[in-house]
A protein has these predicted regions:
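Short polar/acidic secondary-structure junctions
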Residues: 112-114, 203-205, 292
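Predominantly the C-terminal beta-signal and adjacent terminal strand-loop region
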Residues: 294-320, 325
Length: 326
């Protein structure tokens, strides 16, 4: 069919959404007259990074890297405890009408110029942050190229469990003018985020090696005071914006063999705040066993987060989880 609809819900009980509620997290319609020309409209993931476009049912290191939350509607913050809790001293506070996702439309397409060379693009417009009453939209662009096997869908996986041989490179740019205000001076603040990423999955020895890395940069107009709304009130939980603005990277790898996959992740964020305020790094190490691929598996992992903000505590987390997708 040339069109389809997708709905996804979750049970919400966190510090952003009201607890104990079932809420919609994806609700979009896809029009697909051609592979290279598709329009996705509704509540969906803005294509601001590779991890934004990685299926939540196929994350290699239990959850997404904590540094992925510096994109606009993810709260402009670092995350710890396997991406379940904000890192103290990093939170910018920006959210949209819907948390993490955004309301809007994305033009998407994928094509191949040969058996081995594949391309895809994204061009999105969304509501973005609702802190200000301005009508400025959020614009997001992404392009990706793969050599070897294609990753043709709107979403991808963080590991294909040995089913692909591919090398991919991507880049994205995400921006919204006048998305917030300086809560002290009242001056308008613009948001800009860019990232470059690399992904590889190749057979090595009796198994398959997966590797992914990305570098990201967040610009909040060099604002030093907390971000605010249209009437100057600071955004919820927001720290000085220079503790959020900055750049960082992550790298993760895993080796899949006989349904087992040991994995490791390291990430680092260097904020512009004084005296290391907003700086942090983290590593994860773990092991997964796949009963039925990504549809049924068990993961065990340990994460250590080094929060370099003065007076903040480091965080250690151990997790054991069973994951079933149907």
């Amino acid at each position: 069919p040339w069109w389809s609809m997708f709905l996804q819900t979750e049970f919400s009980d966190d510090d952003v959404n009201s607890g104990g509620d079932v809420r919609m997290i994806d609700a979009f319609i896809t029009f697909k007259p051609r592979d290279w020309f598709q329009l996705i409209g509704g509540e969906r993931m803005a294509p601001a990074s590779r991890q934004n476009l990685t299926s939540s049912g196929a994350l290699m290191t239990v959850d997404r890297p904590g540094s992925n939350n510096y994109t606009l509607t993810w709260g402009l913050r670092g995350q710890t405890q396997f991406n379940n809790s904000a890192i103290s001293g990093t939170r910018g506070g920006s959210v949209g009408d819907v948390s993490v996702r955004d309301l809007g439309a994305t033009l998407f397409g994928s094509t191949s110029t040969s058996e081995k060379l594949h391309f895809k693009y994204y061009a999105g417009v969304s509501d973005g942050s609702t802190a200000r009453t301005s009508d400025e939209e959020r614009f997001t662009l992404r392009a990706q190229v793969n050599y070897g096997d294609a990753e043709p869908g709107y979403f991808g996986l963080s590991t294909y469990l040995g089913k692909k041989q591919t090398l991919g490179f991507g880049a994205a740019y995400d921006t919204q003018s006048d998305f917030a205000a300086d809560s002290v001076t009242g001056e308008s603040v613009d948001y800009a985020y860019w990232t470059v990423d690399a992904f590889a999955e190749q057979p090595i020895g009796p198994g398959s090696l997966t590797f992914e890395a990305a570098y990201s940069d967040l610009d909040l107009d060099d604002t030093q005071n907390p971000l605010g709304n249209s009437i100057g009130d600071p955004l919820s939980g927001g720290v000085n914006a220079d503790q959020t603005q900055g750049s960082g990277y992550y790298a993760q790898t895993g080796y899949y063999i006989n349904k087992w996959q040991p994995w490791f992740l390291y990430e680092d964020w260097d904020a512009d705040g004084n005296n290391d305020a907003g700086d942090w790094s983290a590593y994860r190490v773990g092991l997964s066993y796949f009963f039925a691929g990504h549809n049924a598996n068990v993961k065990v992992g340990y994460e250590n987060t080094d929060n370099k903000t003065p007076g903040a505590n480091d965080i250690q987390t151990f997790v054991l989880g069973a994951y079933i997708t149907f």
